């Protein structure tokens, strides 16, 4: 299969080899590596953890890729964080595809995973396949993610048999928040066995990784030991193979009450707020633009 855009030598080279060259200087920088799904499994086997963040546009994607984030998720959380909806339910395929396209065009190394939004895959494996094909063809996504456990195994199997890598999502599934009674931890007590069974079912159906959201840490640890595919936690403790957060939460662009599982690494809201105030003050005071900004 041929991509719709020209690929760089770094992208077409085998993982870790970089572009062909006659001779590499001893102090040459390490070659750029394109992360593939099997590399995440290899990292799990080595006991090496990996990071995943959401991304919805060019500059965040480029920055996170430069930082070495292995996986970027074009999440249905764009519904809240881009389109200002209260939940993830309203966002559509047609809204997410341009975001996924922008992210995939902007990275050189990260694996780009696109969420399948609510209502675009639940009806049948055939519906799931047709939706996923759009993300792969129109957005150049590298993989897709869908929510659900054992009941979604036919969809996962259909996609993987059709050549589309699938990341599963179990535990608390935001698209089912009304059915689950709101934002609640999943897998406590007797329900723990079901979380393990769902992860095993996703692996058997062909998923290359599984996200666990709002699952007790000991249950997530048991899942991680029970499957050979990587586990990715969001509110699922330290023993997962990788972690994922919504970037606006992690870096303080969104304000207000944060979920317990969020650690904020920056206060981007404060930085942008002050910068905007400084800009407005300069304009009102007549000090911008100055001579150095004028032709």
Swiss-Prot record:
The active site is at 213 (proton acceptor). 3-methyl-2-oxobutanoate binds at residues 76-77, 115, 145. Its cofactor is Mg(2+). Pathway: Cofactor biosynthesis; (R)-pantothenate biosynthesis; (R)-pantoate from 3-methyl-2-oxobutanoate: step 1/2. Mg(2+) binds at residues 76, 115, 147. Catalyzes the reversible reaction in which hydroxymethyl group from 5,10-methylenetetrahydrofolate is transferred onto alpha-ketoisovalerate to form ketopantoate. Its main location: cytoplasm. GO terms for biological process: pantothenate biosynthetic process. It is found in: Cytoplasm. The keyword Transmembrane does not apply. Its EC number is 2.1.2.11. Belongs to the PanB family. This is 3-methyl-2-oxobutanoate hydroxymethyltransferase. Binds 1 Mg(2+) ion per subunit. Keywords: Cytoplasm, Magnesium, Metal-binding, Pantothenate biosynthesis, Transferase. Homodecamer; pentamer of dimers. Residues 1-30 are annotated as: Disordered. SUPFAM superfamilies: Phosphoenolpyruvate/pyruvate domain. The keyword DNA repair does not apply. InterPro entries: Pantoate_hydroxy_MeTrfase, Pyrv/PenolPyrv_kinase-like_dom, Pyrv_kinase-like_dom_sf. It catalyses: 3-methyl-2-oxobutanoate + (6R)-5,10-methylene-5,6,7,8-tetrahydrofolate + H2O = 2-dehydropantoate + (6S)-5,6,7,8-tetrahydrofolate.
